Every structure is written in structure tokens, then in C-alpha cells.
Amino acid sequence: MSKSVYLDAFQEVFVLGMRNWIKFRNFAQILRLTFIPSRMKVLKFGGTSVGSAERISHVARLIVENGKNIVVLSAMAGTTNTLVEINDYLYKRNIPGAQETLNNLEMKYRGVIDELFDNEEARAEAARVLGERFAYIRTIVASEFAVAEEKEILAQGELMSTALMNIYLKLHGVKSVLLPALEYMRTDQNGEPDMKYIATRLRRLLEANRDADVYLTQGYICCNAYGEVDNLKRGGSDYSASLIGAVVDAEEIQIWTDIDGMHNNDPRYVDNTRPVGSLNFEEAAELAYFGAKILHPNCVLPAKLNNIPVRLLNTLDPSATGTVIYNMPPDGKIKAVAAKDNITAIKIKSGRMLLAYGFLHKVFETFEKYQTSIDMIATSEVGVTVTIDSDRHLAAIVDDLKNFGTVTVDRDMVIICVVGDLEWHNTGFEAKAVSALADIPVRAISYGGSNYNVSMVIRGCDKIEALKRLSDSLFE
């Protein structure tokens, strides 16, 4: 009988960051006693939510309706991708390509300004502020491009979206104050949030602006330990909101997107999906890690450790219930199915070495050597299968693993993850999940390492059919 072991990504993050998070909780308690006048909410709006003049105006109304809170904004939809494209041109020394792309982006923003502002003075102010941002990018394009400047270019999207929103709110009589993320959001030498620095700097900014109606700040962007502009990686605006929420001991963290919360399956492929009303933090972390794009995986931990509910809401339908994530007790239910694409499965077969002392340790050391994370691992008496989601160092990894046995590689695989209350005494759920895929080839199954998921590795071409069958079996 084969044995299956699940490498719980959430637990891994928890262990690696615990020392910093313990410090962070202490800072949150200090802040609660010293300067936060009342518990605010942290509202994060993603790129699609502020993707046009019409949507910026709509989000502004939502901001005002929610009262005095901290609002975290992403860049307007498409902006970060365009800035990445500009960086690619600069790496290739294609200056004309970078200039043309930048000009097109500026034209887009000019159109947004013209549509958003009917007041000439506000329109001129917006044009001036955004003009400064585009002029700054042009100085980089015209100079000898350095690697450090890549992140400075990427930061401009959030700086522009918050500038537009700030001007728009003030035009409509709202005392909006910008909290520049580059003045308080910092990572340490390990790339982890610098808790003491964030708490201290953010406290000063809030104290200096006590009478504000609304606090606006940028998601995603930060400075590193050396004072250079950096970021929290794609999707990092959720993480920014969660870190801020923990610092101010927020009443609630709201993540606003263009969908009604976390669905029980992928609505792009499966009909009649429905929002999941509530999840506990562990379930949410599993779904976020294994493919639910609505929430960044790193967002969960700060909220969990500070017991702050996270609510997923729809900008286009604010009255929709959405999903609330909190420390809810186990309820014995399957909550949702998610899929993680672009997985590579690697099998090492070696009957002679597998059971030898230290064999698995050597396998793991290989992946550590190339800084490649493992999503799943399943072992049997004669082989071990691991999955990874990055093939950047695949050739080198495979060469090293050949020292331990025969290596086979399957690319274009998918991890299907069934999430819910899967405590061992809640019998039958895992059987229903596996039997639903009866005639779909399953490369590996992982169950037992987490109380909240059962994961199966299948071919990418079988993903949609697998999602539909699981939906029929588990939710009908």
C-alpha cells in the first residue's frame, strides 16, 4: 500500500514566519492601546475594480459609504502588465518599443482623466500628477537601464491609481489623505515583512492625520531592507491589506473584486457554481494556494494570527453576501474545489535506496539547492513523486535526482484540490472525491497531511472534466 504525505504550504509559511509574527502581534497590541481611536476596516480594491473612470467613481462611492477606513488600491487593470512589457523592452534594449508602449499607456490615462473629472481644476491637477509619474518613467527609459529600476517602474501603477482616487475624493468633499506605502511598508533581509518598521512608521502617519475622513494607500509596493523600491509580488495588494489590518487591529479586512466571493468551483469551467458563505482560515489558505485567484495565499496568515475576519466582496454587486473567512469551528462539510495549473510531476524510482536512512532528505535537499518549492509528495515502497509549479531549474534538478534512481517527468499536469472539513473521523468525503474521477488517470493522491484537503494530480487536458464531475458529486 502506498503512503501519501502532503506538504502543507500554509503550515510551512506559518513555521518560517512565526518569530516575526509573534513580534507583530505584540506591536498590534501596543498600537491598540496607544493611538487607534476606534477599530477601522481595511478595504482593498483590485485592478478591475478601479479599471476605468466609471469604476473609479463607483469605488469612490463605496469608500464614502463605508466611513473612516484605510483603503488599499491596486493599479488600474492592465497597467502592471504594460509596465512589465516596458521592462521587457528595456532588458532587450528595445528603446523604441518601450517608448511606444509607454506613450500608449499615457494616452489611456489621459482618457480616464478626461472622463473622470468634469472640474477643470481637478482635471489639471490629475494631469499634472500623472504627468510627473510618466516623466519619471521616461527618465529611466532614456538612461542606462539598471535591474533595480525594474521595480521602480512597476511601482508606478499603484502610485497613479491612488493619486487619481485621492484627487477625485477631495473634489467631492472627502478629506482623503494619502499614506505612501514606500514610507512604511518594508521587507527585511529575508524578504519578509519588517514588522517593527511597518508598525512604527504607519503609526506615525496615522497620528499625523487623525482628522482624515479616509486613508488611501498603495498595495503591492514596498521598500526592501536596503531602501530600494520593491514589491510583495503579483497579487501582493491583498497581502498589503492584511498586514495593515493586523497593524491597526482592524475590525475587518475587505477584499473587493469583480466576483461574489469565493465560489465552490471555477465558474469559468463549471456551470451553476455558488459562493461559499463562510470558510475558516485554513480552508481559505488551501484554496488560495491551490488556484482560487480571488485571494492571495499570503493574505490569510496575518489575519488569522490577529483573529481579524476577511470578507470577500463584489464591487459590481455590493449587496451580494460574498464570503467571510474567520476562525469558525469545523462543520463537517466540503466547501470547494480548486485547480492549480502548470504543474510538473517528478518521480524518482529506486527500490534499493528509497527506504534507506536519509534518502528523502537528500531528495528534498536537491529542491532546496535550486530554491524550488514542492507542492505535494507521495511515496511508495519503490518510488517517490513530487510536484513543483516552477520549471525554471527543472533540467538541473532532474540531473541531480538521477544520482538517486530512475527519474521520469510529467509536464502540463494539474493539482485538483478538494477543500473542507476533512478530519479523519468525517468518513466518506475522500472516497467520493476519488470515485468521481473513476476513469480519469490520476498521477498521485495526497491525503492526511492536512485536515482540510485531499489533492489529486491529473493531466491538464482532464482538468475541466474533473472539475465538472467533482461538482456533480460533491455539491449536487
Model segments located where?
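A conserved active-site cap/scaffold subdomain adjacent to cofactor or substrate pockets
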Residues: 285-325, 332, 339-347
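Nucleotide/pyrophosphate-binding catalytic subdomain
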Residues: 26, 30-295, 300, 459
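Serine residues within intrinsically disordered or low-complexity segments
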Residues: 2-4, 38
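A conserved regulatory-domain signal marking ACT and ACT-like small-molecule sensing domains
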Residues: 321-476
